[in-house]
Structure formats: structure tokens, C-alpha cells
């Protein structure tokens, strides 16, 4: 789809804390720098502060795009022998275990366990966007998926399971930006601006012309197989094999029933009644107190850092 708008919902801790100020500055700058360079306007958003987020801020982002309903490309792998391409940025160690961290139980010590941060390149993303939109006009693409959380292992398993097929992948053919990467690091890397593309066999030159036009790295790293299984090699050495469905929610992936208890503060909140709040003697003081709250005060200082028109 052609992105036409970005939105965000940001949750930070106590604004008086230096750590929160650092979080706010970094997040707002990151959204502004990437979004403005990518060329998609930020049309709506919100910022909220609460001590609950002192250790771990919550950053929600959303993109809205337009695509013709008959040109939607699914994240699916099928067609035995069809080549599997990796396209876009080279692969590094950035973001490894990012998905693990996002799903972990967070404590006050969690900041010590932060994964390495993904290295974003909005200009590469722009090239990848234009190339995929051009690919969308051809009949050569069987399926396509971006590589976000858990990288190659996630994209290959989800596409294979959805298409009821498998893949043979040679990790030795994945373009790398760092030396001496272990196979598991290549599999789990969350380097941004990468796509996994399954192309109909015989159309390789057609899609490669498009990738080359947009000056994108592209490499055939494997092929689709009949068996519902993923095989990962480094050159000719098998380093991992697993059924695709075992890694996909709704397939064979384990589902955990976590223990939980009802927070005590919920019962305290239920006791609140507006009738118990005394009427103020000075409404002006109340208004001034309210508008001084960081959750009510103007967020103009944030909004003005984002492009709202492109």
C-alpha cells in the first residue's frame, strides 16, 4: 500500500524525571527524523504521562495506506521451486532479541537487558517502498513480507505456514553488514528495511530489473519446497530445521497461561464517587491546576517536530 498518514500514541513516565525527559526527547526526535525523511505526514497522535511508565515507555505507531483491493499481496509462500529473495538493507546484529524483550516480564532492572537498537534508514525504506509498489503492478510476486520482529526466522515461518509449504534457505547468501555473525544471529536479526519476497519461477529477471532500478540489494537465498518444514543452511551445512507451523501462533507454537492477580488499586478506584469531591471555592485556581497538568497542557512542542503535510 502507498502510505498516506502516520499516527502515534506515546506513553511516558513522570515528566520530572531525567530518564523520562531523555525518553521523550529521543522518541519524538526519532519519529520526526524518520517520518519526515520518509515523506509520510503525521496526522494525529497523543502523549500521556504516568509513573507506570517510568522504566519502560510504551510507543504505539500506526500507518495508513491506500491499495487497490485486487492488488493486495499476501505474506504467503507457495509454488514448489519458486525462488525466495531477500531485498533491501544488509543484515547486522542490530535488534537481536528485540521481540523477546518486547514479550518479557518487565521489572525495574529491565533497562539493563535492553537489546541492541535497530538502525533505521528512512531513505533506504523509501527506495524499498517504491520498488515494492512497482512490483505490485506485475504478476511475478507470489508473496511478500517485511522483516521486523525476529527477522528471517519469523518471515520464513509465517509465509510458509500460511502457504502450507516450506523453504530451504541458505544463510550464507544473506548480505551482511557485519563480519563473524553466527547463524542464529542472521536468523534473528531485526535489521530494518528488508523484505522477503517469493517470486514465480521464470520471472527472476523481471523483478531483478525493478530492484536494480531502485538500487536495492537483492539476493536469492532459497526456494519454496513441498514439505511443511524450514531448512536453514550455511553454504552446504544444515544448521537448523523446524516445522514452520511450530513457530506460528495458531499452529504448533506453545501458548502460556500466565498467573495473574487482580490489582488492589482497581477496588480503590471503584470506591471513587464524584459526589465526594467538594465544590471548589476558586474555579480559576482549579482551571490553572488542570491546564498545568502535562496530560492536558498543549503538546504543540511535539507536534511541530513532525511534518503534517508532504
Predicted feature locations:
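Glycine/proline-enriched, intrinsically flexible loops and inter-domain linkers
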Residues: 1-310
Amino acid at each position: 500500500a502507498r502510505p498516506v498518514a502516520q499516527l502515534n500514541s506515546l506513553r511516558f513516565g513522570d515528566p520530572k524525571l531525567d530518564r523520562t525527559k531523555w525518553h521523550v526527547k529521543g522518541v519524538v526526535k526519532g519519529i520526526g527524523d524518520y517520518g519526515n525523511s520518509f515523506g509520510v505526514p503525521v496526522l494525529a497522535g497523543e502523549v500521556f504521562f504516568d509513573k507506570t511508565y517510568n522504566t519502560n515507555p510504551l510507543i504505539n505507531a500506526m500507518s495508513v495506506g491506500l491499495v487497490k483491493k485486487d492488488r493486495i499481496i499476501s505474506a504467503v509462500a507457495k509454488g514448489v521451486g519458486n525462488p525466495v529473495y531477500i531485498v533491501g538493507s544488509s543484515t547486522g546484529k542490530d535488534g537481536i532479541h528485540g521481540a523477546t524483550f518486547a514479550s518479557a516480564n518487565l521489572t525495574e532492572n529491565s533497562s539493563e537487558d535492553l537489546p541492541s537498537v535497530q538502525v533505521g534508514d528512512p531513505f533506504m525504506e523509501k527506495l524499498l517502498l517504491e520498488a515494492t509498489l512497482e512490483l505490485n503492478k506485475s504478476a511475478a510476486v507470489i508473496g511478500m513480507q517485511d522483516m521486523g520482529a525476529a527477522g528471517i526466522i519469523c518471515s520464513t515461518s509465517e509465509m510458509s505456514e500460511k502457504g502450507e509449504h516450506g523453504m530451504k534457505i541458505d544463510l550464507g547468501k544473506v548480505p551482511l553488514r557485519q563480519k563473524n555473525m553466527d547463524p542464529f544471529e542472521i536468523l534473528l536479526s531485526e535489521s530494518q528495511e528488508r523484505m522477503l519476497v517469493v517470486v514465480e519461477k521464470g520471472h527472476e529477471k523481471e523483478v531483478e530489473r525493478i530492484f536494480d532500478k531502485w538500487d536495492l540489494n537483492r539476493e536469492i537465498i532459497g526456494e519454496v519446497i513441498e514439505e511443511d518444514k524450514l531448512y536453514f543452511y550455511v553454504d552446504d551445512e544444515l544448521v537448523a530445521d523446524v516445522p514452520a507451523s511450530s513457530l506460528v501462533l495458531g499452529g504448533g507454537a506453545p501458548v502460556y497461561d500466565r498467573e495473574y492477580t487482580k490489582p488492589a488499586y482497581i477496588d480503590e478506584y471503584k470506591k471513587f464517587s464524584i459526589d465526594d469531591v467538594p465544590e471548589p471555592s476558586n474555579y480559576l485556581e482549579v482551571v490553572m491546576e488542570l491546564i498545568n497538568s502535562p496530560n492536558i497542557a498543549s503538546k504543540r512542542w511535539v507536534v511541530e517536530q513532525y511534518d503534517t503535510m508532504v
